[in-house]
């Protein structure tokens, strides 16, 4: 347990990294499929709990990122879990329109390794459900 956490200080229980971030996995609440990986800071996690909607922290834009703010592919949060080391958050979500990835796919994990260590490659195995050019206008 995080020694710095005080009773009632649920944000203090999380083991934030040196940049004040925690990795987050979004998982489909109905199927348990892994949809995506992202980051949260304290504000993002607090907003996620408050709104019951996934809010992440964009490291490239240095700001909160409300999932679906541009695409409409919102994630309604059904459950929030913290792993045994208290340094990874799991969101069980309902993915609006079934598209979590900016590539227009259901999951960001659409590339599968095939082959051997000597001749392997990453192959896209999941279909594009919607052309990203029609998602981000």
UniProtKB/Swiss-Prot annotation:
Q: What pathway does the annotation place this protein in?
A: Amino-acid biosynthesis; L-histidine biosynthesis; L-histidine from 5-phospho-alpha-D-ribose 1-diphosphate: step 3/9
Subcellular location as annotated: Cytoplasm
Q: Which GO terms describe its biological process?
A: L-histidine biosynthetic process
Residues reported in the UniProt entry to bind Mg(2+): 83, 85, 87
* InterPro entries per UniProt: PRA-CH (IPR026660), PRib_AMP_CycHydrolase_dom (IPR002496), PRib_AMP_CycHydrolase_sf (IPR038019)
Subunit record text? Homodimer.
Designated gene of the protein: hisI
Note whether DNA repair occurs among the keywords: no
Q: How is the cofactor bound?
A: Binds 1 Mg(2+) ion per subunit.
**Root EC class:** hydrolase
Q: What's the protein here called? A: Phosphoribosyl-AMP cyclohydrolase
Q: Which domain of life is it from?
A: Bacteria
Alphabetically sorted, this entry's keywords are: Amino-acid biosynthesis, Cytoplasm, Histidine biosynthesis, Hydrolase, Magnesium, Metal-binding, Zinc
Q: Which GO terms describe its cellular component?
A: cytoplasm
Q: Name one GO molecular function term.
A: zinc ion binding
Residues binding Zn(2+), per UniProt: 84, 101, 108
């Amino acid at each position: 347990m995080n020694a710095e956490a005080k009773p009632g200080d649920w944000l203090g229980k999380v083991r934030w990294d040196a940049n004040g971030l925690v990795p987050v996995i979004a998982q489909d609440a109905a199927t348990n499929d892994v949809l995506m990986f992202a980051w949260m800071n304290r504000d993002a996690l607090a907003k996620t709990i408050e709104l019951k909607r996934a809010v992440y922290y964009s490291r490239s834009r240095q700001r909160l990122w409300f999932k679906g703010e541009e695409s409409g592919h919102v994630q309604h949060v059904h459950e929030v879990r913290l792993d045994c080391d208290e340094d990874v958050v799991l969101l069980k979500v309902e993915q609006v329109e079934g598209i979590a990835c900016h590539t227009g796919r259901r999951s960001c994990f659409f590339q599968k390794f095939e082959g051997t260590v000597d001749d392997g490659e990453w192959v896209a195995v999941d279909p594009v459900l919607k052309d990203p050019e029609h998602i981000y206008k």
